[in-house]
Structures are given as C-alpha cells and as structure tokens.
C-alpha cells in the first residue's frame, strides 16, 4: 500500500507537471488577467493571446511562464518565442539568430514537435521527458507536487510583488506564435503566472504607470509616470540604459516585458527547471534586449531566442552549480508555490502559441535529450562572454517603466545593457549573462539558483551588491558567461545600493523592496551607522544619530531632531521605511534616522530595519535623480547601506539620500555652541520660511518638468525612494569595474546645483532647502532657509519660500536642465552658469559665476565631510556657516540680478520700480524692451532721429547698467552685512541662551547631585523594604502555595469522596433493585415450593393412611398366619406324637 500510495503521489506530481496543456481554468484566467493588466502584454495587444494564454497549462515547475510582456507585445512574445529558437541558433551567433528569427522559430518548432499550435495548449514532446526529469526533481519547494498552489491559477494581482528580478522564466516563447498574435510580432503571448510578476509584465510596457497596488514602490512595478520618464530610482539604471542605448521604446519595452515575463515565470518554476528555463529566458531576454534596439521584432526575436538558447544551455549546465542566497531561498520557497504553477502556464502558452514545445521544455529536452544545435549554441553563448550581451546592453534601454516592469533582474537581457540603470546598481554585465544570472538566481531561489547566484555573482561582486544580488542581476555583467556567471547575481553597478538578497525578487521591478518583498535579506551591519554588536547594549539607542557630537551634550537630542519642518514634509524620522533598503551608514556622522530598526522590508525581515537616512527630499534630489536618468549621475546608495528587506515591499522605493544627510549630521555633530549657531540659524530660518511654504513634501517635486515623473506611487515613496540613494557621479555606465562601497566616490556625488538655479525643477511647493543635498557643503535647505529668512527679513512681502524660489527658479530652471544635460554630457555643471532671469549684468554674471563655481560647492564638500563634524566640530560649524552664507550670497546674487533689472526699469520709471518689489523677477530683456517701446512710442514729431535716439538710448542704458551694477554691488554689500548682522545676532542669541543655560548649570548640578544622593538613599531604603516585603511575600506565597496544595488535596479528596458516595449510592440502588428482583423471585419460588410441599404433604398423608391401612391388613394377616402357624404347630406336634407313637409301636413291633 505504501508503495502504491507513493507511486500515486508521484504520478500526481508528474501529472501536475507534465500536463502542460492541463491548466486549471483559474490559472488560465489569472494568466489572462495578468496579460490584460499588462499594458504592453502580448495578451493585451494580441487578439489571440487570450486564447493561447487561457489554454496554457500550469507551467511546468521547471519552466517558469514568461512573466512580463512589454508594450511591444509582438516583440516580447516573438522574442520569447525566438529566444528558445535562438537557443539553437545562438550556437551560430546572436547576429545570425537575429538575422533569421523566423527560421529559428520553425527550427525550434521542429525540435519541439510536441508543441501544440499557437492556439492549442502545448505539452511539448520534451515535456514528458522534462516531466520525467522534473518529477524526480519535483519537491514541495519546487512546486512539483500537485498542490493547490500549483494547480490553482496564480493570481495576477500584484501580490507582495515577489521580487521577480530573477524570474526571467525560461523563454518558453514559441517561435511560431507570430501568426497567432497579429498584434505581437510573432511572439507568443507570455503569460505571467505570478500575480506580482504579471504586474511586472504590465509594468513591462516602457511607460506604463506602475500597477503595484501597494503604496510602496513595488520593485516589480514601475513608478507611475505622468510624463515620458518614470523616475524610478530603482529603474534609473534602466533609464541610464535608456539613454545610453538607442531608445527602442517599442523593442525595449517588449524586451523589458519579456525579461520581466521570463523572470516572473522563472520564479514560479521549480528550482532546477526554473534555473534552466530562467537562464534560457534571461539570456533570451538579454538577447532580446540587444536585438530590440535594432529591430523590435526580428532583432528582439532573434536576440531573445539566442539569449534563450544560451541561457537554457547555460542554465542546464549551471543548474547544479547555482545556490541561491538564503534570502532568495526563503523568498523563492515562499513564492514558488504560486510561481511554479505560473511557470507551467507559461510553458503551456509557448506551446500553444507555437508548435514548438515551450522553450523551457525544449531547452531541457534539447539540452539533455537531443543535442539540438540550439542547446549547444546556447551553451556556447552562455559560456562565451555572450556576443549578445553587448547587444542586450544597447537593447536594454527600455522605457523606465518597462525597465521597472522587467525589473532589473527580469530585464536580465535588456537590463544587461551596458549602461547600468542609475537607480539600480547596474553592472555592465552582459545582458545575457545578467539575464542568466537573474534567471539562475531566480531559479536558484527555487532550486539550483542559490548556489550559482551566490557563487556566480557578478564578476564585479560588490560586497554590498551581494546583498542585492538581484540588483546585480539587473545589471548583469555583459562579459559574464551565461553558462556559469548567470548564476551570479548581477551586482547593480552601485555596490552601495546593496539591497538585501531578498530583494532579488523584488528589486527587479522596483527597489521594493520590500519588501518589501525582502525580509530574507540579512541586514548588513554596515547598513546601520551603529554596529549591530551594540544592539545588545541596553544604552544603545538605535534611533540616535550614529555618531554623537563629541563636545555637544545636547547633541543626542538635536542630532535626532533635525529640522522638524524639513523632516515633517519629507519623512517621519521614526518612520521605518523598508523602501530605503539601503540607508547610508557610511560615516557615523552621517545623519541617519533609523527606520524602525525592527521593521522588516516587505519580506518581514526580523532584522531591525536599517536606519534610513531621512534627509529631506528636495528638488535637488530630483535633479540628481534626473541627472542619474541621463546617465551622468548615478543615484547610489551609501556603500555601507545594506539592503533593507522590503518589499517587497519592499515599499520598495529606496529614497535617494544625497550625501547631504551627512552634512546635516555633521551639523548635528557640531559642538553645542556651533550647533546652536549654525543649526539654529538654519532651522530658524527654515522654520520661518519653510513653515510658510512648507507643503507636504508628498507633493512630488516637479521632476515632471523633466521626466513628467510626478506620478510617483506616493510622495512619501518618492521621498523614501530618493532618500535611500545618494547621487553619485556614475563612472561611464558601461564600465564594469566594481565600485568599492567604501571608496570615497561621493565627491563626484555632489552635483553642483545652485540651490535655486540648478534645481532641475522649480517646484514652488517643494523647498529646495527641504533636504540637505550633497550639492553644497551645507544642506540646500540650510542655505535656502537662511537665504529665505534673510529675504523675508529684507522683503517683508509675506511670501513662502516657494514663491521666493519661483522667481529665482523661473529662469534658472532652464539652466538647470542645461546643467543636467551638460552633466549628462560630462560637462561640468559650472560650465553652465545660471544668471539672473534674463541674464545679469556683467557684475551680476560675475557674481553668479563666482557663486556658481563648483569649487565653492565641491570645496565646501571637501571639509563638510561627516567625520569633520565629529573630529573638529568648531571648524565644521564655521565652514558650514560659511557655506550657508555663501549659498545665501548665491541666492542673493540671483535676487540682485532681478533687482538690477528692476533698478534699470526703475530708472526708466520710478513709479514702476516702486510698484515692483525687488523680489519681482522682471527679465531685463522685457524691461528694456518696454523701455525701448516707451521711447519708440514718443511722438514721431520728435526733433531727434531714430539713430540719435538709439545712440542716446544705448548711452543711457550703459549708464543704467553701470548704475545698476553699482546698486547691485552696494545692495550686495548691504545684504551681506545685514545678513551677517542677522546671523551674528542669531548666533549671539544662541550663545547667550547657551551661556544662560550653562550658568545655572552648576547650581542645577549641585541640586541634582544632592537630589540624586537622596534618591539613592531612598532607593536603597526602598530596596531594603522591597527586599523584606519580597521575603514576606515569598513566605506568604509559600504558605499560600502550601495552602493551595492542601486545599487542592481536600478538593481532590472531596471530589473522590463525592465520586465514591455517588458510586456507592448507585451501587446501593442497583443492589436494591437486585434485592427486590431477588425477593420477588424468591417469593415466587417459595410460593411454588409451599404449594409443592402442600401437595407432597397431602400425598404423603394419603400414602401414609394407605400404608397404615395396608399395615393393619398385614398385621391382621400376620396375626391370622400366626394363629394358623400355631394351629399347624399344634397339628404337627399332634402328628409327631402320633408318629412317635406309631414308630414306637412300629419299633416295638
């Protein structure tokens, strides 16, 4: 029986795996839903997709369903289909595969004869073999067993988006689907088995707004973008790829979708199969990405096929090698149940779409059974650096959203694109290798991947990136051999982002983390400013700033309390944000506000959430993010930041945290006096201005101007999302050199944004000063706060900081864009001078250029290092104050430029000048044009001719300009002096407060000491009393316990007695009943006996009477006989006498 049961179970498992054509209706529906949800999903665009997808049987665990389908559904599907076909072709060359995607599809179809028609659910011929193979592999973890999870359709709803990064499912794409899907380019509709993955696929469409239902960024889902760009910091690397690569919006999208689809399906695939299939799918997706730039269909298909083949081969080779990191194992184990069925569906889909058996099936079959050229080619491609990887690099640039959908891991192919997305630590690994790594990692999560993922991390295995090997996968090193390295997680180029391994799944779509998705990822000690070892210390305060000001007793309080205004809007300092999985713990001085240390990302990490820097988000951060989008700057998590498990969720939006937090922390670390002088100024000014114009930071900064990215999932997400990153000037995105997390790369990080000018977006509601940015040694918020305070003081006009900034930003906004472009081009920001609104006079320009000079910013940064605050607080405070003043001067210069324009206008019309306060920004061009118009309007009958008037006007203008310059200079001096006076007053006030506090300090100390002594005595007495009380209580308790025991004994005895009494009563009753019965019975017997006795007696009497009568008779007879006898005797005697007489007579005779 046991054998029979096991056999039946095994058969069930095989049946679950093998009937690829048998897809539970729920699954098909879920697949359909997912495809429908996918904006660019093949299902959505292809009329036949739904049909194909519906029949899709639960994807074989070994073959994850393709998860994401890009907007270029045709490309994605085709690429998926071709990806398997190209597996064969890839042996020849990726270019060849691209050249002949269609032929490959037929070829692949031939190799997979069992695949059903596009509309038919296909159980690849290889599938039985696969099933056989998979059955031995099948395990609960692989979802091979027939379980509700595998049988039930995986729902498309974005479940806590399982980090799909690795999920690139084996490209099950079947080459033939082209006829099936008119909308798609001969690409089989890819079913996203995993709900989260389906969401990724939905996101796959390049610009599709994120569909993640969770407010937190789902790594799987791109951030919704109002405009062309989605500023998904996680997907910034994608953006970078985007820029670096030719914008193959359709192809990239399709590829991205494909990648996400594959990745997603791979997640659900059982570890071993998924490893192969994922490797195939990832490679295919990588190749698709490569081909995508060239031709959306053929290129994508060919590349995808080639990548798929190589991935399949490599994955086949690598399956045993891959070992997924523990976090991946957990996540995948968790996700596998749902994911595995999806994989089956995906396989079925490809089968349905094209007669070619699903790539996954065919790949294993081809690889194992038939030495199909595809398998060999794929293996070769995997082993080789992967020619396609370069192409995938170009192809990688998908739409940000599509990139997000693909999720760096999913977009393994696309993502591999040489430009690592800024948001992700993109490693320039080959897309194929990246895809392979992602695939392998993902499948490793299910089975082999763990080993490979860990061992094969990017050649550039940044220690921190290891945490986010998913991220690494996202940026798969282009040179990695898919066969071996695909397993390695691609460390995102940003080792600092260091997402938790758990995020591998989540990260691909978005830094979720966490999520995020997410709890599996161990929190790196480096993540926290404080050492984990300190956590055991009862005195250790996880929420306190990591480094305490050496000299400032108040530091602990203020260090944690940074500008409430700034902090309020951007982040809750105590708010645990799983979104910022990596909080820079670089310098103890860095100002980190720990998210709740215990908060786990989405994954439910038990590890304390990493302290998340909560620098206030500012437009500068947005600028940084934008720059990162342009590949010039890379948003990079602090190298020490450890991935915060998310997820899933992890609320996955890592906030880009500029180095500025360090500046803030440094301020915090300054001595009390300095701190009071500097921070109080800063905060006071900010409170004055920021309070007025403070708007809930949740309003996304106007990056929408650049990126139309205003549709972040939530402002809070944006904040966290940006804050978790530090913008670091990226080395060429294509560079594959690992960046040491510890290496001080951050000087490049400090973009020189003029606070008002360079901020890419003038978001009036957003305080540029809101978050300290690395741009200036002092946080911009500090500078702006001071400037704004000064401005308000100068100009009583009650207008919030935003309003004051708008005039400054109106013109500067464009320069900031130029600046960004320049940065993207590699030109120094300083090259772009931001001048007063229309252009300032020479003096104004000179001042602006001097102020804007990067040396001032970078120089300031040089000494505004986080360590400086601790090492030399006074110097730090002084320098910080100087920086703040300098920033104020810069802002004032802009204002002066405006004022100059106003002054020139005032010279023309004093009344008009009075009408416009100096704050009003009037373009000088407009001003002069007005002046010119007024002059021209003079009656034509004027004595002077136009030339004379023009010359006179020029002279007058020159004079006006000179005067304006003088005015601006004097005004500058006045403002500076006034500002200095105000600042000094504030400083003096702070010092006075400090001194006032210090003077009574001694008395307080004495009193407190005495009080402490008294309290100590009282405490001792109380302790003694407490001890006696405790003793008495202990005695009482003992007695009580004894009494309880006695009572319990009595109770037990009573209960026993009661039971006995009841038993006896019952017995008595029973005995009585028996007695009564016996009595009745005895009575009956007695009666019967008496009757019998009476009868007997009657008979006896009768008999006795009879016997007596007979006795008498006999007696009478006896008497008669006796008489007769006596007579006889007498007669005899008489006879004898006679005889004697006779004899005697005879004798005698």
From Swiss-Prot:
GO cellular component, one term: nucleus
PTM annotation, UniProt: Phosphorylated; which is required for localization in centrosome.
Tissue localization of expression: Expressed in brain, kidney, lung, thymus and ovary. Not detectable in normal tissues at protein level.
Keywords: Coiled coil, Cytoplasm, Cytoskeleton, Nucleus, Phosphoprotein
Compositional bias ranges of the Basic and acidic residues kind: 358-368
Spans annotated as Disordered: 1-73, 91-227, 247-430, 463-617, 636-665, 696-719, 756-780
Domain of life (superkingdom): Eukaryota
A single GO BP: astral microtubule organization
Pro residues compositional bias, start-end: 155-180
Subunit structure: Interacts with microtubules. Interacts with YEATS4, GCN5L2 and PCAF. Interacts with CCDC100/CEP120.
InterPro entries for this protein: TACC, TACC_C
SPAZ domain ranges (all copies): 508-596
Biased composition (Polar residues): 13-35, 267-284, 300-317, 541-561, 701-716, 770-780
Identification of the protein by name: Transforming acidic coiled-coil-containing protein 2
Chief localization: cytoplasm
Pfam families noted in UniProt: TACC_C (PF05010)
Segments forming a coiled coil: 877-905, 948-1148
Subcellular location as annotated: Cytoplasm; Nucleus; Cytoplasm, Cytoskeleton, Microtubule organizing center, Centrosome
Any one GO molecular-function label of the UniProt entry: nuclear receptor binding
